[in-house]
Amino acid sequence: DAFKDVDFTARLTKKDLEILRDVPEEAVKLALLDILGEPEVQKDWGGEQCDIWTDRITIDGGRHQAAFALKGPAKFHPMTVSDLGKNGDQIARLAHTAADLLVVQHCHTVKAEVVEMLRTYALRPGHVRRYMVLNGYDTLRILRHFGKV
């Protein structure tokens, strides 16, 4: 529900996407935490399960837990599985949380193989949950809507 008023149909260009080249991952993280009303800032370290853990997500009025994996401009190119941690296991780590919603956010486009991997983990029998991909265009729309860029 936090993003319900964001216009995800607004047309953006590759030139617009370049804005995110200079926005550090930490700035996106802090902006998302603020938008979600999450006061806890998790420290980054290499083997973390997620970059953001929150129970302040609401979907259709109901409260849910969400785990976010964020990828900033150090990898300013279309996201592939190899960009997801040293062993390509960041989505697997994300999926090992108790989150009801798994979110992958990137500052650029996201390749289909990443979306398929996220979908596979999210729809795992016995622990089905929602998933969301925020590519660079979606991220920019959110940040602009909330006056963060």
Features from the language model and the residues they span:
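Mixed-charge (Asp/Glu-Lys/Arg
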Residues: 1-149
